[in-house]
Regions:
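Contiguous beta-strand/loop segments that form the cofactor/metal-binding neighborhood of enzyme cores
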Residues: 145, 151-197
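Glycine-rich phosphate-binding loop and adjoining beta1-alpha1-beta2 segment
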Residues: 1-9
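Short glycine-rich anion-binding loops that position phosphate/pyrophosphate groups of nucleotides
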Residues: 42-43, 92, 193
Length: 197
C-alpha cells in the first residue's frame, strides 16, 4: 500500500514499548521528531496523544481524540503546557463530492432548512464484536466507530448542533435525530447484516 510505495524504509512497530525506546534513541542522538501520527484503537488515543506531546511533537490523530468528553479538558491542558498542537483527522471533509455539496449549501437560500435521511448500513463479520471495535468501553460504540465521520461531515456542511436525540443504540445499531442550523437529520447506523435491505 501507501507505506510500501512511498516509505519502504520507514521503521515499523507493533509494540508501543519498542516504539518508545526507538524514539528515545533518536532524540538522544540529536534528531528532532516533528510529528507523531496516532492510528491506534480508540481507547488508546488519549494516552498516545499525551505521549507525543510530552515528546515535544505535534500530534495528528484519527477520530476520536478522546472517548469520554470529560477527558478533553485535561488533554487541552497538556497541549498548552507542551506548546505543541493536536490535529484531528476527519477525512470526509476532503472528499471532492463533500466539498462540492458544502459549496452548494452555502449558495442556497439562507433560510432553507434541509431534511435529510442518513442510513448507513454495512455488515461486519464475527471478528468485529470480538475485537476492540465491538467493545463499547474501548471503541465508544458504533457512534464513535462510524457515526462520528457522518456527524462531523453534516456539522461541517449544515452548521452547529441545535438539538441531538439518540433514540436507540445497541452494539450493532444506533438511531436518532440531529437538528443543525440548516438541516434536520434522521439518522440510522448499523453494522448488522440483518439490517441490509
Amino acid at each position: 500500500g501507501i507505506m510500501d510505495s512511498f516509505f519502504p524504509e520507514a521503521s515499523f512497530f507493533t509494540e508501543f514499548e519498542r516504539f518508545d525506546r526507538y524514539l528515545d534513541m533518536i532524540k538522544r542522538n540529536g534528531q528532532q521528531i516533528d510529528y507523531v501520527c496516532v492510528c491506534s484503537p480508540n481507547y488508546l488515543h488519549d494516552a498516545h496523544i499525551r505521549f507525543g506531546l510530552k515528546l515535544g511533537c505535534d500530534v495528528i490523530c484519527e477520530k476520536p481524540i478522546v472517548l469520554n468528553p470529560w477527558n478533553i479538558n485535561s488533554l487541552i491542558q497538556v497541549e498548552k503546557e507542551s506548546s505543541n498542537k493536536v490535529h484531528a483527522i476527519l477525512q470526509l471533509r476532503l472528499h471532492p463530492s463533500i466539498i462540492s455539496l458544502k459549496d452548494r449549501i452555502i449558495k442556497s437560500s439562507s433560510d432553507k432548512i434541509f431534511n435529510i435521511d442518513l442510513k448507513y448500513i454495512t455488515s461486519r463479520g464475527k471478528w468485529y464484536h470480538h475485537s476492540w471495535k465491538g467493545d463499547y468501553d474501548k471503541s465508544g460504540g458504533i457512534l464513535s466507530n462510524i457515526g462520528i465521520h457522518f456527524f462531523d461531515m453534516l456539522i461541517w456542511i449544515f452548521g452547529d448542533v441545535i438539538d441531538l436525540k439518540k433514540e436507540f443504540e445497541d452494539k450493532s445499531t444506533a438511531k436518532g435525530v440531529i437538528v443543525l442550523e440548516k438541516a434536520k437529520v434522521n439518522w440510522f447506523l448499523s453494522v448488522d447484516y440483518e439490517n441490509i435491505p
